[in-house]
């Protein structure tokens, strides 16, 4: 049996990509952090809109010998390096995450990761072995997204592709659909309970190691 780790040494990086302070996405971030905190693990929040993160990958950020990240990316890379669980929270806009989230992938997660390394199936030195949790939301229903091929495209591009390209240990994706203004508080609370359960499960995996599939709820995708 795996010896439990000291929870105070376990860190989660929560990357939030929604501009609305009163949004359900912000509620997800707060709830996840609160639940992980109850388990005495550490979370750090990177609110991309709050810090006005620049999503544009500049020419001098392309992976070349002597690569040196810009200061904002260097600080983000330090956050990633310290974390074992990367948590992405974003809405689906026009079938994809917001540009600010894609820019985070380009500039931070993909920093100094070359096409040659990608084609050779070499994992990212910064991300290999880390775990990814995604919470996404959409105003449209899940069946509507599936009918138009958007759900499959997103899953392949952000779940399967990123996990394999960067050498992540796993990806657990929970999606909440039909998220619109004026949601019934009971509906919101039901969804936030799913967030709490997911936070507990992911924190447990980090502390105790991989658990038998029967003890873990299956990913919601």
Where do the protein language model's features map onto the residues?
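N-terminal beta1-alpha1-beta2 submodule of the flavodoxin-like/Rossmannoid cofactor-binding fold
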Residues: 1-114, 190-221
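FMN-binding flavodoxin-like domain, especially the glycine-rich phosphate-binding loop
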Residues: 99-221
């Amino acid at each position: 049996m795996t010896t439990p780790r000291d929870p105070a040494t376990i860190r989660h990086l929560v990357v939030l990509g929604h501009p609305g302070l009163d949004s359900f996405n912000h509620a997800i971030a707060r709830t996840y952090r609160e639940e992980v905190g109850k388990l005495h693990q550490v979370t750090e929040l990177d609110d991309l809109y709050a810090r006005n993160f620049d999503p544009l990958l500049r020419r001098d950020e392309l992976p070349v010998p002597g690569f040196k990240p810009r200061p904002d990316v260097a600080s983000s890379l330090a956050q990633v390096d310290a974390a074992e669980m990367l948590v992405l929270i974003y809405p689906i806009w026009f079938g994809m995450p917001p540009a600010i989230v894609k820019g985070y992938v380009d500039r931070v997660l993909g920093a100094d990761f070359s096409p040659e390394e990608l084609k050779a199936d070499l994992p990212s030195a910064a991300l290999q072995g880390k775990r990814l949790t995604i919470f996404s939301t959409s105003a449209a229903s899940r069946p509507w997204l599936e009918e138009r091929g958007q759900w499959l495209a997103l899953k392949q591009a952000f779940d399967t592709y990123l996990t394999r390209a960067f050498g992540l240990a796993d990806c657990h994706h929970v999606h909440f659909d039909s998220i619109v203004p004026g949601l019934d508080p009971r509906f919101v609370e039901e969804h936030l309970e799913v967030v709490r359960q997911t936070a507990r499960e992911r924190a447990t995996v980090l502390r105790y190691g991989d658990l038998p599939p029967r003890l873990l709820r299956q990913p919601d995708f």
